Every structure is written in C-alpha cells, then in structure tokens.
Amino acid sequence: MSKASVYEAKTESFIQPILDSMNFELVDVEYVKEGGMNYLRAYIDKEGGITVDDCEVVARQMNEILDREDYIPDSYTFEVSSPGLGRPLKKEKDYVRNMNKEIEIRTYRAINKSKEFYGLLKAYDKDTVTITDEDGNETTFNKSDIALIRQALDF
C-alpha cells in the first residue's frame, strides 16, 4: 500500500464521523503532489449540493484532528471541496446516483472507430458498465477499457 493510500484511508476514517453527523457524503479523498506541493483533499457532497460554508465547517473540524493525530510527516495543504460537476464515477454510490442518467464514457482504445460514448447508465457491476444510446442501442464496456466515466454535462 502506497503512503498516499495509507494517508487517504486514515483521513477517511477520521472524516467519516464528522460527515455522518452532518448528513454529508464523502465522495473521495486524495493525497497528491502538484507543482512541488502536497495536497490532502476531501471531496464532500449532500442532497442539494455543498456550500462554501459547509466545506469550511468540515475543514475546521478536520484540521483539529490532523493537527492532533499528525500522521502525515510531509508538509501539505488540506482542502475540502465539492466534487464538481465533471467528477469521475468511482464508488458504488456514484453509479447508484447516476442510474438512468446521461453519462460520458471515454475509452483507452477506439471501439467501432470511437473513443467517446454517451448514453443512459443502465447497469454496472464490478467489471462492466452498460449504457443505452439515444437510438436505444445497448453497449457494455469492460471497466478495464474505460479511461473516464462521468455524468455527461449539458450546456
């Protein structure tokens, strides 16, 4: 297990009770290096959407825990954010939330001369994702072939 995975798992275990008490959902935790800086990020959500004030309350409570537990020896910045509209589907609850909604799939290699697919999410399991396009055609993708899967953005 990488040190990033250890930090993420430990952070999840500390932040989850805070979020549960507020009826918020933990979407993801990531520990990444960007531009020479380390970032520990928690992405949270709730029915109706997360506000800046929500993020601030969670960050304040979590910062107390991070200072007390001090399990990350490196210098880092802790951020709490809404996951944003274009976030990838990663966890089971992301798939459940997006059932029968329009999603975008990008594949690593072209399938029938295309790498981008749009359709309604109809089914998923640990290995596959099935969508139905606007013509009613059903396509099943192996998750190992998917580079990106997210809710489609309508503009």
From Swiss-Prot:
GO BP, sorted A to Z: ribosomal small subunit assembly; translation
Alphabetized Pfam families for the sequence: DUF150_C (PF17384), RimP_N (PF02576)
Keyword Cytoplasm recorded: yes
Keywords recorded for this protein, A-Z: Cytoplasm, Ribosome biogenesis
This protein's record includes keyword Plastid: no
SUPFAM superfamilies: YhbC-like, C-terminal domain, YhbC-like, N-terminal domain
Subcellular location: Cytoplasm
CDD domains attached to this UniProt entry: YlxS_C
Annotated GO CC locations: cytosol
Major site of localization recorded for this protein: cytoplasm
Family to which this protein belongs: Belongs to the RimP family.
Function: Required for maturation of 30S ribosomal subunits.
Official protein name in the record: Ribosome maturation factor RimP
Native organism: Agathobacter rectalis (strain ATCC 33656 / DSM 3377 / JCM 17463 / KCTC 5835 / VPI 0990)
Gene field: rimP
